Amino acid sequence: MAPVGVEKKLLLGPNGPAVAAAGDLTSEEEEGQSLWSSILSEVSTRAGSKLPSGKNILVFGEDGSGKTTLMTKLQGAEHGKKGRGLEYLYLSVHDEDRDDHTRCNVWILDGDLYHKGLLKFAVSAESLPETLVIFVADMSRPWTVMESLQKWASVLREHIDKMKIPPEKMRELERKFVKDFQDYMEPEEGCQGSPQRRGPLTSGSDEENVALPLGDNVLTHNLGIPVLVVCTKCDAVSVLEKEHDYRDEHLDFIQSHLRRFCLQYGAALIYTSVKEEKNLDLLYKYIVHKTYGFHFTTPALVVEKDAVFIPAGWDNEKKIAILHENFTTVKPEDAYEDFIVKPPVRKLVHDKELAAEDEQVFLMKQQSLLAKQPATPTRASESPARGPSGSPRTQGRGGPASVPSSFPGTSVKKPDPNIKNNAASEGVLASFFNSLLSKKTGSPGSPGAGGVQSTAKKSGQKTVLSNVQEELDRMTRKPDSMVTNSSTENEA
């Protein structure tokens, strides 16, 4: 209690209030200074951590691989216009924590090697450290993937060599890239997926930061800059399975070769599909992570065959060997083009465009064709054996020979118009058929009846075979002889 009483006396003494006021003033000044220092430090930190400008993305790929469509989709535009030579666009990058914006330059090289000289306008020796390279491969044509990647990688290597970067600077870029590759760490579970600026890494001990040695086929082609292999049109995997009989073995074989290529260049691998909007957001986050250092919390994805994602530094030969366990008809060391064979080209038959022929030329051709043809006979000369009614005559059987005559030597006389031929012929026919009917009803079982029937059939056949018009002509020409012949037949 004594110390408390002494403290009270000191505070209430003649100089006590003054001492207390001075002490309070000193504490307020210290608080004000600390507040100003914190504000200044925050401002300086924000100024120092502002998103850098001048970052570049260099895109390579074949014509029709979808590289322009892919980058246009990442830009947020609905439709992009295909350029020629060297295309340019930009990606908008936003830091949500510090409300900062910047633009990332995107350069897309034409698929024709003729335009590779334009790379000097996109990337220089000064801007190379701030550049990210994207190799685009078309998965709808997997037989072209490896050849395309090798071609564009050699084009980039040739361009870097032409820059004549000092060896010390180039070795520094390569060492930094190797360190970034080795420092890859698996994202922790439960981390938020929003892109945030990367802070300083905290580690418990130096043993955890020891970099593992690189494998035999890892970073054998170190370009000194980050590389990303993007496979587009991965929605075509189902089409490959239906039309080209691709199986899981084919897809695993393709993936194994792609991952080996990525190991050689220290590249990341991602399968995308603009049509199905698959892995596009993941691609954007990984680009800003590698370019601006944003936090990235997505682990490797190898389960779905059309949505593979392998970040740089995660893969190795042992993980790739897991794919080889499913190989039955192919070996891991087999050449890519020996197993992934280009299908035969189906020739499309196009309808030829027909040009209208000149009218006069057409008529001249028709005239020449008609002149070459033999003269066609007229109707009268075409059917000389036909009668006026058009029915053919029986060959080898003349009109007069078909009817027996009592006067074979008599000549044919002209008919007399005064005689009624029709009435006489009708009377003869009526008497003839009446005699047949009377004989048939009188003795149906007698042999004579059968003979009469056969005779009637024969005469009927003769009547059918003979020409009607010829019979009429004969009857009009020889009325007398016809009446005599008819009576003779009745008596028989």
Swiss-Prot record:
Residues 471-480 have a biased composition (Basic and acidic residues). GO terms for biological process: microtubule cytoskeleton organization; microtubule-based movement. Homodimer. The cytoplasmic dynein 1 complex consists of two catalytic heavy chains (HCs) and a number of non-catalytic subunits presented by intermediate chains (ICs), light intermediate chains (LICs) and light chains (LCs); the composition seems to vary in respect to the IC, LIC and LC composition. The heavy chain homodimer serves as a scaffold for the probable homodimeric assembly of the respective non-catalytic subunits. The ICs and LICs bind directly to the HC dimer and the LCs assemble on the IC dimer. Interacts with DYNC1H1; DYNC1LI1 and DYNC1LI2 bind mutually exclusive to DYNC1H. Residues 371-381, 452-469, 482-492 have a biased composition (Polar residues). This is Cytoplasmic dynein 1 light intermediate chain 2. Keywords: ATP-binding, Cytoplasm, Cytoskeleton, Dynein, Methylation, Microtubule, Motor protein, Nucleotide-binding, Phosphoprotein, Transport. Acts as one of several non-catalytic accessory components of the cytoplasmic dynein 1 complex that are thought to be involved in linking dynein to cargos and to adapter proteins that regulate dynein function. Cytoplasmic dynein 1 acts as a motor for the intracellular retrograde motility of vesicles and organelles along microtubules. May play a role in binding dynein to membranous organelles or chromosomes. ATP binds at residues 61-68. The modification Phosphothreonine is found at residue 441. GO terms for cellular component: centrosome; cytoplasm; cytoplasmic dynein complex; microtubule. Residues 187-206, 371-423, 437-492 are annotated as: Disordered. GO terms for molecular function: ATP binding; dynein heavy chain binding. InterPro entries: Dynein1_light_intermed_chain, Dynein_light_int_chain, P-loop_NTPase.
